[in-house]
């Protein structure tokens, strides 16, 4: 499954990053963190800074709303910032794919012992979707399919994030006419289904 961030055409691409930062801030708030979005400190900009309300652990989050593969140096830079700022953890949250080198670093890092591995966490599409499901922010794509009552779904279901709402975009194949229609399913209002036919 894919996650797309959608903004008005008049807005800059930095707005996509803000949507992702805001989403991460909401998820961290649920997990008992006090959150500050986009702060500038000497020599760096931090997308999301969070401090846990109970154990006072600190977290730096780098949010990347990129469509192209994320280069490995983004991971190195985040890890350096975590060390320089004496943070307890760093999160890399990316809606796009990781480059080959970045995948290699992620794999190496996730094979470290628990104490080392806890310093850096990677959240790509599957893990972001898990966080959203577990926090109750979205319902599963399977639940959406049941509501839409169609037998012919295409595989490329997408979660579309906008500034205010989240939608599942579900391609439905029409075997009779050889067309694909898209149903957008609004997360906050389960009865509100919009259908757009594409010929």
Where are these regions (language model features)?
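Mixed-charge (Asp/Glu-Lys/Arg
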Residues: 1-199
